[in-house]
Amino acid sequence: MAPSGPGSSARRRCRRVLYWIPVVFITLLLGWSYYAYAIQLCIVSMENTGEQVVCLMAYHLLFAMFVWSYWKTIFTLPMNPSKEFHLSYAEKDLLEREPRGEAHQEVLRRAAKDLPIYTRTMSGAIRYCDRCQLIKPDRCHHCSVCDKCILKMDHHCPWVNNCVGFSNYKFFLLFLAYSLLYCLFIAATDLQYFIKFWTNGLPDTQAKFHIMFLFFAAAMFSVSLSSLFGYHCWLVSKNKSTLEAFRSPVFRHGTDKNGFSLGFSKNMRQVFGDEKKYWLLPIFSSLGDGCSFPTCLVNQDPEQASTPAGLNSTAKNLENHQFPAKPLRESQSHLLTDSQSWTESSINPGKCKAGMSNPALTMENET
């Protein structure tokens, strides 16, 4: 356990303040770009009224979407595992008293028995977080900066001072998209005035510095943002997170880098949702609850197709993809309604427990 006291508390407060420096930098840069473009370029330097109106209208639309998506990415709290993944007080007490042997493993085995988890550690053990004292849901990871387990964690982004995960990944993608469009639009409309100032085609004024530096900044950020946005578009198309791209998820049958991929269309809908009218808006519309995800690994993992006794559940082929026969959340089940039927006559849809875990699995702790 981390040391406590006045000194450590002061250090934590200091770190929390320092973590906001990148966000303050982006905010100040955005504020300056507004002044440089809207005032110095459009109002001061542009002489054509029609050009002014068109540029200002398009600019303010992109500016508003940029700020909205950035705000949502920063201030949307990451989702943490629900209470069913936490150990009970009795189980925690047993873990503290028992050595790391068979008795210790049996506690974890019983706790994970009915949870909808299919990923494992590299050694094939249940993924357990000592720090949070919980069994990690699939695609959940512990963030050392936030000191929490984050559902479908992608990465911790210093530019938003927040973890990017299930609750705000769509907002992060839109933030990248609108910031890229914002920079490209500024660079494209500023180019002719940049050339005129560079070749002394316009008189030296206060606007010269702002317009020339604005073009350099917009062009530079366009290059970096285009590569980052392109990379995350590829991740979405494969239904991967940044962490899963660097280290493929491990399932019961072994490692599979495409274990969560359902095909391009369904992968897109996992992040953006079923209603396309919300795709371009920073409004949460992702499918599922962040605790369980459909996979395509039933054929390789017979346990994933198993159900508790008394349940009449089946899993059928959907465009050559197989899904675990477990109850899905209402929004998540939309992925399967086109050509796959689910029989859930005895399943309580309000819970996210299903499936049976292999009692012979070796249990280990993972932080």
Curated annotation (Swiss-Prot):
Residues 38-54, 192-208 are lumenal. Keywords: Acyltransferase, Cell membrane, Endoplasmic reticulum, Endosome, Golgi apparatus, Lipoprotein, Membrane, Palmitate, Phosphoprotein, Synapse, Transferase, Transmembrane, Transmembrane helix. Residues 330-367 are annotated as: Disordered. The keyword Translocase does not apply. It is a multi-pass membrane protein. The modification Phosphoserine is found at S341. Autopalmitoylated. The chain crosses the membrane at residues 17-37, 55-75, 171-191, 209-229. Residues 333-348 have a biased composition (Polar residues). A motif (NPxY-like endocytic signal) lies at residues 358-361. The keyword Ribosomal protein does not apply. Changing S306F: In a hepatocellular carcinoma sample; somatic mutation. It is found in: Postsynaptic density; Postsynaptic recycling endosome membrane; Cell membrane; Endoplasmic reticulum membrane. Residues 299-367 are annotated as: Mediates localization to plasma membrane and recycling endosomes. Ubiquitously expressed. Reduced expression in colorectal cancers with liver metastasis. GO terms for biological process: peptidyl-L-cysteine S-palmitoylation; positive regulation of AMPA glutamate receptor clustering; positive regulation of endosome to plasma membrane protein transport; positive regulation of long-term synaptic potentiation; protein localization to membrane raft; protein localization to plasma membrane; protein localization to postsynaptic membrane; protein palmitoylation. Residues 127-177 form the DHHC domain. It catalyses: L-cysteinyl-[protein] + hexadecanoyl-CoA = S-hexadecanoyl-L-cysteinyl-[protein] + CoA; L-cysteinyl-[protein] + tetradecanoyl-CoA = S-tetradecanoyl-L-cysteinyl-[protein] + CoA; L-cysteinyl-[protein] + octadecanoyl-CoA = S-octadecanoyl-L-cysteinyl-[protein] + CoA. Monomer. Homodimer. The monomeric form has a higher catalytic activity. PANTHER family: PALMITOYLTRANSFERASE ZDHHC16. This is Palmitoyltransferase ZDHHC2. It comes from Homo sapiens. The gene is ZDHHC2.
